[in-house]
Amino acid sequence: MVSFGIDLVEVSRIRRLLERRGERALVRLFSPSEIEYALRARPPLSYQRLAARFAAKEAFIKALGRPVPFREMEVVSKGKQPYLRWRGNDCPLSLSHTGDFAIALVMIPEELIPPRTGP
């Protein structure tokens, strides 16, 4: 069985985080290529791109059902299609952003879902 995760992020939340913590927050949450891609655009698009990637990582954690350090995940593109890469595996991903919201939906294939333990 596959697992799906979805997350919605306010772009202003990411903007405020970066205004307060700057580069420290960027390198803690995003890979160098994610940062480079986002910062190729000027605000507000750069904030929207980062918010979408943040939402993708949150959606992945929800779908997986356990915490994962943000730096272990990376949003990558194959052509125009984004994927969330984790441990060398690419999970299908859909991203969208507009105004003050970014949303992500990720699908984790069955073989990547850890077995449940306990009752």
Over which residues does each language-model region extend?
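Core catalytic alpha/beta fold that binds nucleotide/phospho-ligands
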Residues: 1-119
